[in-house]
């Protein structure tokens, strides 16, 4: 599921952001953003000049200088507001999570068994390794692993999903989260973390903007922006002595004022992206949480945007996960109804989706009704990992169904013969992407039940989109190569790994990484932990084991393996937003150059009026218009920074062309229109002469 998203400009968030924007005027906060720190210094300098003019300490227009100073302060405040609004949204999410933390008591056990005596202690006093008993109605006091028992657990406080889930000892569903509630039965849980280190505590820390560290790409972009700013600072600094020399040489004109030079500098440096960069990063983490995915850092979100190989589990991601019986294929000399009757009998007590589907198919094909095993004096033989088959004993009949090699051993151990024709049936089912289940009665092989993996609707189209983006999809399955190849062809994946083991997955990831690729995968079991730790983007399922969650750098609260595709989408959207706004910000400089340079030097060099292509009213209105536009464009781009640019699956080259046209050419044209409109408004209001 997806968490309900707050409105972008929710009044309560806006009020808080306005207050925080003022608090961020603290120099200790401002110097962390080098680009905006230059604007901050410029604001202080022009304010000092304005006060000096008012005090008759220097010459100049108090109205013009005061207006420039005011709009420079607005530029700083708008950038502060963008960051504060993004952080405010994250803090609101953190507060809602913090609200789920309750002070609770725990029933501490002396040992790992339920029968031991319990001691009532505060949940905050529990330490890693402590064992607790949690019964129906109790809140689970800590993150941990289920040692004994099984229970229905309400995890809605963490996941937002109202449907309860089953947590039990052993297997891949043994991990529990502190703050969730047991609805029925009981669990013996061993705490896996100390207080303050729980999953909920980590979630809160991750989504709070104050805890966010800059990602490598952000650091690289900041270095670029600082370099551009230094270039423009040096270029602007040379204009003052150049202006003095020009006035002396021409015996006319006027020296460019410090106020105009500060205005020029602020308009030329990349203030738009400088003011929004932090907000984009915070918003990316926030959007990931909106998809019910917790990222351990911005680095993980950023890596998701660069991923070019996806390793996807077949079951639950590419297929629906519940294989359905689709056909009865009898052995030579066996009637189809005889096979269906035996298969149904062996499945009457089988509660797996496959077993239930065999009962239903026999009923549909031959109107075979369910029978009472007790009335038949039958004994059900459950499936086990050792025998790899299940079945039923009815009086003197011994019916078994299972994997082909398991049934072959069973038949041969009963002095029977496994027909070549059945081997051929098994191979034909595997070639079409099905899973063959062989049925035998005593030493006699009756035939094959074909189980069909149902490929999810629309998944093939999603893989086509990923291919357009240059992302390779690899299906991971434990099936034999024939079955895997058939399902891979039907689903449209680029490659597959059959008969996959944890070691094979780890080797495949390392192989792709050695080729310079970034790999993303999902996992939920302890056996997935090595591969999750190796992958660049590792999404662990919340329903999985503690080892899997600790190995991953993201946790999907919905435990939906398909979410990996959405994670990549959000990562790419964040990178695109940053790149698009950087392009727009730098392209903006051209129009501001044409606005301010002619205005600054027109008195000394009237010929520069030829560069006044926008036909701005006067030097003062031209400079004012450029400064006002420079401030307002930050406000207008806040929604884009927080929501992200619209994203369409396409190749990197096509995306680059699209964004250069949209944000590059747009960044060139929009300021010309905006500055001209502001100039007309200033003249109409008689604000600038």
From Swiss-Prot:
Query: Where Mg(2+) is bound, by residue?
Result: 524, 528
Active site: residue positions: 313
NCBIfam families from the entry? ATPase_P-type, kdpB
An example Gene Ontology molecular-function term: ATP binding
One Pfam entry for this protein is Hydrolase
Q: Does the keyword Transport apply?
A: yes
Q: How does it assemble?
A: The system is composed of three essential subunits: KdpA, KdpB and KdpC.
Q: Which Gene3D superfamilies match?
A: Calcium-transporting ATPase, cytoplasmic domain N, Calcium-transporting ATPase, cytoplasmic transduction domain A, HAD superfamily/HAD-like
Q: What role is this protein assigned?
A: Part of the high-affinity ATP-driven potassium transport (or Kdp) system, which catalyzes the hydrolysis of ATP coupled with the electrogenic transport of potassium into the cytoplasm. This subunit is responsible for energy coupling to the transport system and for the release of the potassium ions to the cytoplasm.
Which residues of this UniProt protein bind ATP? 350, 354, 383-390, 401
Q: Which reaction does it catalyse?
A: K(+)(out) + ATP + H2O = K(+)(in) + ADP + phosphate + H(+)
For this entry, the protein name equals Potassium-transporting ATPase ATP-binding subunit
Cited SUPFAM superfamilies? Calcium ATPase, transduction domain A, Calcium ATPase, transmembrane domain M, HAD-like
Q: Which UniProt keywords apply?
A: ATP-binding, Cell inner membrane, Cell membrane, Ion transport, Magnesium, Membrane, Metal-binding, Nucleotide-binding, Phosphoprotein, Potassium, Potassium transport, Translocase, Transmembrane, Transmembrane helix, Transport
Give the similarity note: Belongs to the cation transport ATPase (P-type) (TC 3.A.3) family. Type IA subfamily.
* Signal peptide (residue range): none
Q: How does it sit in the membrane?
A: Multi-pass membrane protein
Ubl conjugation keyword on record: no
Q: Name the Enzyme Commission number(s) assigned to this protein.
A: 7.2.2.6
Cell compartments where the protein resides: Cell inner membrane
The superkingdom of the source organism is Bacteria
| Transmembrane regions listed in the UniProt entry | 35-55, 62-82, 220-240, 260-280, 594-614, 622-642, 665-685
Which cellular components does GO assign to this protein? plasma membrane
């Amino acid at each position: 599921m997806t968490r309900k998203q707050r409105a972008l400009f929710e009044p309560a968030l806006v009020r808080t952001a306005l207050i925080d924007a003022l608090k961020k005027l603290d120099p200790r906060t401002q110097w962390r953003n080098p680009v905006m720190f230059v604007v901050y210094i410029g604001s202080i300098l022009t304010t000092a000049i304005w006060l000096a003019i008012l005090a008759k300490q220097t010459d100049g227009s108090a109205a013009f200088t005061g207006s420039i100073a005011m709009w420079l302060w607005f530029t700083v405040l708008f950038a502060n507001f963008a960051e504060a609004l993004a952080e405010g949204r994250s803090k609101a999410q953190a507060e809602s999570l913090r609200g789920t933390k309750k002070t609770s008591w725990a029933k501490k056990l002396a040992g790992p068994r339920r029968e031991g005596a319990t001691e009532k202690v505060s949940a905050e006093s529990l330490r890693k390794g402590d064992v607790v008993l949690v019964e129906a109605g109790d809140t689970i006091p800590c993150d941990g692993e289920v040692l004994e028992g099984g229970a229905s657990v309400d995890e809605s406080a963490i996941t937002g999903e109202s449907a309860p889930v089953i947590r039990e000892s052993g297997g891949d569903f043994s991990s529990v989260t502190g703050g969730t509630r047991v609805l029925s039965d009981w669990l013996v849980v061993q705490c896996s973390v100390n207080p303050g280190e729980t999953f909920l505590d980590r979630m809160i820390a991750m989504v709070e903007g104050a805890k966010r560290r800059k990602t490598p790409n952000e650091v690289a972009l900041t270095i670029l922006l600082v370099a551009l700013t230094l270039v423009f600072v040096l270029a602007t600094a040379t204009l003052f002595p150049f202006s003095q020399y020009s006035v002396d040489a021409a015996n006319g004109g006027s020296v460019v004022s410090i106020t105009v030079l500060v205005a020029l500098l602020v308009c030329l440096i990349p203030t738009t992206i400088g003011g929004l960069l932090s907000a984009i990063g915070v918003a990316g983490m926030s959007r990931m949480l909106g998809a019910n995915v917790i990222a351990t850092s911005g680095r993980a979100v950023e890596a998701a945007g660069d991923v070019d190989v996806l390793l996807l589990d077949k079951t639950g991601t590419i297929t629906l996960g519940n294989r359905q019986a689709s056909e009865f294929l009898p052995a030579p000399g066996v009637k189809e109804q005889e096979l269906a009757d035996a298969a149904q009998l062996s499945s009457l007590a089988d509660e797996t989706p496959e077993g239930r589907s065999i009962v239903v198919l026999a009923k549909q094909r031959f109107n075979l009704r369910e029978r009472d095993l007790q009335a038949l004096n039958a004994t059900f033989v459950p499936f086990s990992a050792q025998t790899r088959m299940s079945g039923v004993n009815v009086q003197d009949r011994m019916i078994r169904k299972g994997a082909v090699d398991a049934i072959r051993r069973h038949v041969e151990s009963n002095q029977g013969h496994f027909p070549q024709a059945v081997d051929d049936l098994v191979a034909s089912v595997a070639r079409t992407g099905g899973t063959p289940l062989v049925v035998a009665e005593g030493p006699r092989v009756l035939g094959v039940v074909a189980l069909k993996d149902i490929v999810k609707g629309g998944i093939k189209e999603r893989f086509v989109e990923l291919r357009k983006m240059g992302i390779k999809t690899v299906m991971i399955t434990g099936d034999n190569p024939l079955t895997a190849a058939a399902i891979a062809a039907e689903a449209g994946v680029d490659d597959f790994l059959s008969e996959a083991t944890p070691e094979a997955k780890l080797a495949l990831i390392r192989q792709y990484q050695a080729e310079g690729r970034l790999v993303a995968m999902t996992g939920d079991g302890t056996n997935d932990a090595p591969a999750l730790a190796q992958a660049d983007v590792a999404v662990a399922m919340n329903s999985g084991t503690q080892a899997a969650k600790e190995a991953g750098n993201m946790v999907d609260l919905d435990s939906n393996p398909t979410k990996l595709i959405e994670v990549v989408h959000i990562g790419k959207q964040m990178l695109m937003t940053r790149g698009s706004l950087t392009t727009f910000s730098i392209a903006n400089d051209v129009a501001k150059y044409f606005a301010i340079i002619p205005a600054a030097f027109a008195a000394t060099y009237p010929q520069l009026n030829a560069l006044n292509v926008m036909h701005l009213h006067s030097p003062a209105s031209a400079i004012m218009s450029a400064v006002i536009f420079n401030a307002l464009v930050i406000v207008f781009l806040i929604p884009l920074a927080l929501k992200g640019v619209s994203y369409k699956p396409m190749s990197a080259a096509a995306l680059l062309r699209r964004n250069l046209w949209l944000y590059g050419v747009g960044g060139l044209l929009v300021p010309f229109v905006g500055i001209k409109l502001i100039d007309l408004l200033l003249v109409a209001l008689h604000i600038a002469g």
